């Protein structure tokens, strides 16, 4: 609870009854959020494609293709947190007797249950901050995609050509299917019903009121469309250098358009405290015209140059020109040397630009270790240890002020074929990205509030950080006193600076034909030697090889690989295979208890399968993932999701699991 002076107390401590997920392990009534969150939502996908191809006279053809797909994801997330004023006549209104602060936290004194702030003299009711005892919210995301493609291709007067018309539409909706209340039922006019006990177990009447408050429905809809017209043609120019292969010129053009729209429904008015969405109806669009030309010139039998140039004109990001040069040299039959250099351009997506703003949890403590008010011995009635450690609130969504990403790319490699059926490629790559589009990490904002002061929105309020304000306006304008936990940090898309990375890609492929069948071995691996990244524009470039990336906490692995061994019987009726996915270890986000760097161990997963073709056109595959039931290595990283103790970006929390795949070809 929060008294009229903004001090925080836990009337239910140390019993912490009334919710099965409350624990006293940290010296207060803490909620185990991960235990009430579905880490692997149930997914379902149905898709189909129809294709018609007809040959036309003189080596031409027309093709029509239609694709339809429906996918859904259903799961549950942590419960609603409520923050309602209490009626002093409620039988559960605190009396002041026996009240203590949150564990070891020192609160302001004396306890003020008067309903009037002792500093300002303004009315300030006592607020009950509590968790839905039914624990989880249930939701569903539904996506329907349709695409139609019309293509003409063939040869005419020595020219190879293709022309395509494409139109696609993607419709999605987000809905709550359980655990979301109509707050007017629980707290008419913002005052908690006296039937509800926010500090302990519910009475039968209180539980019945909570159960009857839930409402289901679609709260947000989205629609994306895209159309494009593509024309491409190529023609041989002749063998001017007697290289044995004629030079070729290719050129083409493209015109496309896309739209984005996202809007909330009237149902969102009743559930905005759960979604963090204010009512919105946002949209955006763009048109693009592009033209390219490519010239492939063999200057001798062993040496080939390829030069291309592309110009794009965006209705919202202007004109850009990018070129690419490729060289291929084969001094020996068994050895090929290849390389390329290019520039690139990527405009922010319409979602990056126009996604609706919404409030949601931001990982990390409210103001982090960099805040002088959040140091031991510096706490006050407003900057308490509780409010400094509370999970903060972030404002998410699009940003129409984004700049486009640009890139420079270089690679140089060799292809070696020392014996028949064995191919080895080794390529060095170097990539430079500028104006990368991402989000500034919450940990960076909390850890250095002075540098990121423009990303912190404070307000004149005692709104508890762990409670999501119903609207952005309320998060920015609440009373009566100044506290850092009222407001939010800005987590909208931003240009976060530069990334420079280089390393090596290794590929080894080998096949063997034997009396018992054909064996194929394949290795695909990447070694990263440099990964420099800025966490904000103008910030220092940090070498993160073997560490967690700052922006998304995805490890920059020194080495990772996929190895596969497949076997096919001589009659092609049977098949089997094994695969290994390996990721090298890295430095964890937080040090150990002694302040030393903590390392996350390497991770290897072995998968296998057996397949059979019992009849023509039917293949049945039985597979096993994580054959050796390997547990993921422990990590203490705060990943911005609710996967606790393991890295959900690479690890499989299912451990050993089985699957079956049926494929029938008409």
What is each residue range found by the language model?
Residues 2-43, 49, 59-288, 316, ...:
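Surface-exposed, low-complexity loop segments enriched in small/polar and acidic residues
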Residues 56-59, 155-160, 238-248, 299-303, ...:
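Short loop/turn motifs that connect adjacent beta-strands in outer-membrane beta-barrel proteins
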Residues 53, 67-71, 166-170, 252-258, ...:
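Outer-membrane beta-barrel pore domains and translocons
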Residues 52-54, 154-156, 235-237, 293-297, ...:
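Residue-level signature of outer-membrane beta-barrel architecture
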Residues 46-50, 146-150, 225-231, 289-295, ...:
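Hydrophobic, lipid-facing positions within transmembrane beta-strands of outer-membrane proteins
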Residues 423, 434-435, 529-532, 581-589, ...:
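C-terminal beta-signal and adjacent terminal beta-strands/loops
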Residues 62-64, 161-163, 229, 247-253, ...:
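Transmembrane beta-strands of outer-membrane beta-barrel proteins
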Residues 360, 521-613, 628:
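C-terminal beta-barrel architecture of Gram-negative outer-membrane proteins
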């Amino acid at each position: 609870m929060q008294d009229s002076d903004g001090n925080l107390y836990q009337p239910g401590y140390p019993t912490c009854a009334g919710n099965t997920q409350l624990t006293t392990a940290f010296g207060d009534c803490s909620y185990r959020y991960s235990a009430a969150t579905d880490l692997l939502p149930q997914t379902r996908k149905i898709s189909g494609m129809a294709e018609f191809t007809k040959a036309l006279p003189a080596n031409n053809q027309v093709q029509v293709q239609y694709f339809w797909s429906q996918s859904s994801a259903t799961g549950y997330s942590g419960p609603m947190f409520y923050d309602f004023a209490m009626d002093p006549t409620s039988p559960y209104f605190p009396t002041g007797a026996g009240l203590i602060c949150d564990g070891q936290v020192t609160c302001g004194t004396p306890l003020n249950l008067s309903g009037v702030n002792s500093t300002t003299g303004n009315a300030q009711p006592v607020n009950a901050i509590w968790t839905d005892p039914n624990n989880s919210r249930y939701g569903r995301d539904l996506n329907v995609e349709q695409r139609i493609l019309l293509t003409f291709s063939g040869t005419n007067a020595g020219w190879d050509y293709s022309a395509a018309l494409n139109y696609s539409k993607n419709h999605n909706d987000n809905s709550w299917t359980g655990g979301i209340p109509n707050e007017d039922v629980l707290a008419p006019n913002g005052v908690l019903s006296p039937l509800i006990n926010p500090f302990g177990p519910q009475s039968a009447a209180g539980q019945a009121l909570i159960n009857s408050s839930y409402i289901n429905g679609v709260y947000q809809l989205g629609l994306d469309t895209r159309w494009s017209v593509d024309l491409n043609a190529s023609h041989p120019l002749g063998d001017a250098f007697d290289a044995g292969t004629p030079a070729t010129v290719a050129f083409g053009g493209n015109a496309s358009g896309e739209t984005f729209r996202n809007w909330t429904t009237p149902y969102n008015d009743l559930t905005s405290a759960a979604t963090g969405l204010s009512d919105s109806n946002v949209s955006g669009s763009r048109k693009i015209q592009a033209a390219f030309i490519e010239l492939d010139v063999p200057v001798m039998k062993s040496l080939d140059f390829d030069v291309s140039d592309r110009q794009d004109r965006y209705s919202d990001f202007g004109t850009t020109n990018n070129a690419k040069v490729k060289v291929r040299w084969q001094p020996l039959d068994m050895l090929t040397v290849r390389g390329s250099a290019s520039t690139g351009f990527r405009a922010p997506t319409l979602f990056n630009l126009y996604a609706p703003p919404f409030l949601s949890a931001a990982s990390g403590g409210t103001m982090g270790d960099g805040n002088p008010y959040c140091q031991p011995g510096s706490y006050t009635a407003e900057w308490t240890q509780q409010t400094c450690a509370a999970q903060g609130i972030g404002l998410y969504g699009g940003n129409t002020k984004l700049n486009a990403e640009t890139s420079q790319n270089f690679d140089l490699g060799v292809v070696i074929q020392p014996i028949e059926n064995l191919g080895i490629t080794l390529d060095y790559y170097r990539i430079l990205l500028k104006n990368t589009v991402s989000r500034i990490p919450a940990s960076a904002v909390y850890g250095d509030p002075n540098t990121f002061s423009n990303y912190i929105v404070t307000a004149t309020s005692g709104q508890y950080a762990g409670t999501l304000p119903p609207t952005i306006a309320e998060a920015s304008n609440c009373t009566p006193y100044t506290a850092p936990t009222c407001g939010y940090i800005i987590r909208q898309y931003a240009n976060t600076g530069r990334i420079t990375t280089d390393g090596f890609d290794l590929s080894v492929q080998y096949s063997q034909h034997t009396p018992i069948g054909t064996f194929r071995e394949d290795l695909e691996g990447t070694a990263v030697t440099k990964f420099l990244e800025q966490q904000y524009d103008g910030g220092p470039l940090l070498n993160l090889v073997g560490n967690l990336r700052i922006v998304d906490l995805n490890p920059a692995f020194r080495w990772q690989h996929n190895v596969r061994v497949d076997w096919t019987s001589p009659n092609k009726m049977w098949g089997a295979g094994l695969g290994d996915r390996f990721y090298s270890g890295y430095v964890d986000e937080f040090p150990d208890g002694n302040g030393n760097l903590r390392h996350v161990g390497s991770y290897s997963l072995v998968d296998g399968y057996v397949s059979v073709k019992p009849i023509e056109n039917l293949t049945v595959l039985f597979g096993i993932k994580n054959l050796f039931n390997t547990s993921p290595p422990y990590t203490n990283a705060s990943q911005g999701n609710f996967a606790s103790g393991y890295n959900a970006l690479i690890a499989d929390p299912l451990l050993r699991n089985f699957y079956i795949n049926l494929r029938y070809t008409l």
